[in-house]
C-alpha cells in the first residue's frame, strides 16, 4: 500500500509512464523490455559503483541512488519500474531483478511460493542495504594516503 499518494494517483502516474514509453518505442512489448533493461542496468551500475569502485565519491553516489530507490518504494507500494513492466509486457512472467536472481531456486528443486518469494526478496533487500551502508562506512572512514 503506498504511503504518500493514493492508489488512483499512483495508478495514473504509472499509466502515464507506460503511455510515454509505448509512444517512445511504438510497441508495448519493446517498451516493456526497454524498462526491464533500464531497471536491471541501473541495479548493476549501482552495485558496481558501491562494491567495485574505490572512489569515495562514486561509492557515495551509488549509495545515494540506492537509498533514493528504496525511498520511492513506499510511494508506489513497491517498485514503480516493476509496475510499468507489468503493464507493458501484459503477461504473468515477471522479469524484474529479483525474479532473475531468485529464479534458479526452482531449477535446483526449491520452487518458491509467492509468500516465500516475497520474504526472500525482503530479506535480500535488507541484506543488500546493510551491505551498501557498511561499504559506505568503510570507504568514508578510510584514511587516504594523501591525508596522512
Model-derived features: positions:
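Membrane-water interface at the C-terminal end of transmembrane alpha helices
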Residues: 128-143
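Hydrophobic alpha-helical membrane-embedded segments
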Residues: 56-86
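Core segments of transmembrane alpha-helices
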Residues: 36-47, 121-129
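Individual transmembrane alpha-helix segments
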Residues: 107-129
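Cytosolic-side membrane-entry/anchor segment at the start of a transmembrane helix
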Residues: 2-44
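Extracytosolic (periplasmic/ER-lumenal) interhelical loops and adjacent juxtamembrane/interface segments
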Residues: 89-114
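Non-transmembrane, juxtamembrane loop and terminal tail segments
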Residues: 147-148
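Hydrophobic alpha-helical transmembrane segments
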Residues: 46-54
